[in-house]
């Protein structure tokens, strides 16, 4: 639907994309949609939220690379910011089979698989990355106490 609604009548604007990410195809669809929308609406700010999941790290990396390469092909001078908030270490969240978890877990708590969140910003506003990274670093320090 986003493809049909872009470009909007006003040239300036922003869109936040938050796919379900329930299926592997959601990652591919998000990348394809963003590159397509950026080609039609090259001055629009496009924000993509994505989860940081250890078991899908390669899929997420592929999605981000596809978006960045596609948007750079549309405009090699485009500003793209990739911001990440880590609430835990990536390796702290390993996948455990249910049987193994039930038999061997001392505390009976399965470690969460989501270790943070990311936001890819296409046509990011000036100084967004610098000001946001300082803020994110402070939040991470508070969370990890």
What are these regions (language model features)?
Residues 1-145:
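Class I S-adenosyl-L-methionine-dependent methyltransferase catalytic core
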